[in-house]
Amino acid sequence: MTHLVDLLEKKRKIAANLEDILSVDSKRTALNDHHSRRKPRPCGMTIHTGVGCSYLCAYCYIYDMGFTAVPKPYPLKPEEIVYALTQNPYIVPERTLAAYGSVTEPFLPETVHRAIEYVRDIWRWLNLPTQLSTKAILTDDIISGVLSGDPNASVLITVVTLSNRRLEPRAPDPLKRIESAGRALEKGLKVSLFIRPIIPGVTDREAEKILTASADKGIDSVVLGSLRVTESILWRLEKSGVAREEIEKRLAEPLKGSGQIEVRSSDLKDKIRRLAEEFGFKVFRAACEANIYSHGRYCAMCRIGPCNIDVKAKGLDEEDLRDLLEYLGIRYLGVEVDDKAVKIMLRKTGMDERIKYLVSTATYRKTIIIKA
């Protein structure tokens, strides 16, 4: 077997080991959970460490999704969520990125223990590269907990304003977040500034102060991201002192109830990017790029790649790809491989979308299907 097939065999063996450990009820619970079937997002497979968040940030989308301000730890036990991931057809051990912090703050008092457990067990069993996004203060316990799980974890500290506390009424003071991030860096945690979402008329005007405060604490990398709004998010932003017209004039399309609409901000991103580069920051084009760098990987899966070109692409030849396709039961006519893409020649262009995604994830390259 070549190393690509080894990855999928590893997943099968982990699942078999866990089946011997878990009870019938635990296995049923894991199989019924969405982590067992959900397709990863561009940032990776979002791992839910809890549901709901008490920070009540005005720009947050989770309340439109039905989540409340009363957070609860996610119900799956650590080994149950690992088992769920082994059943997910999109997941590849050692390759799929794990993103923590999508529908809750991972380090709330109610969720921090579960978050650390998940990081430790998912890394121990599957070696999925860890990324956590947070507005919490990084305490010594959190820092040591993350490092003991995945020592190369990428941690994103969210700061979008220093002055408008109405936007994040229950979140920790942003300067204290930055200060704790500096301490975490000194202890070996890989921390980046997370300026997302960029709120027009707010974040762009405070960007220089945010970058200055972060640079003073030793942070030297940043991820930038745009805002998405619903009708209720826009209402909350306006109530928090944000100029409504600044948002409305940038909407990609009209608002539709709870539907999330992009707020165009490429000009603001460019402005902040230039500022950050003047400060000496490494500006990541997406959150996943920060995770790739943190773990010393090379990736050319998507249109923004290749990422981390200072690292040599993992060796891959045509035999590796042929073995993987045969293992997956794919009939092919030919294959081509380079550092940026794998090309698969088929008699017809149709290929199961999950298989195509799996090949890209396993190889960290874009997959191109060619009708021969």
Place the predicted regions along the sequence by residue.
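Auxiliary Fe-S-binding modules of radical SAM enzymes
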Residues: 2-6, 208-372
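Intrinsically disordered, low-complexity boundary segments flanking structured domains
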Residues: 30-35, 84-89, 270-272
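Short, glycine/acidic-enriched capping/hinge loops at junctions between secondary-structure elements
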Residues: 59, 70-71, 110-112
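Short microdomains enriched in Cys/His and/or Lys/Arg
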Residues: 70-88, 320-329
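Conserved AdoMet/S-adenosylmethionine-binding subsite of the radical SAM
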Residues: 79-268
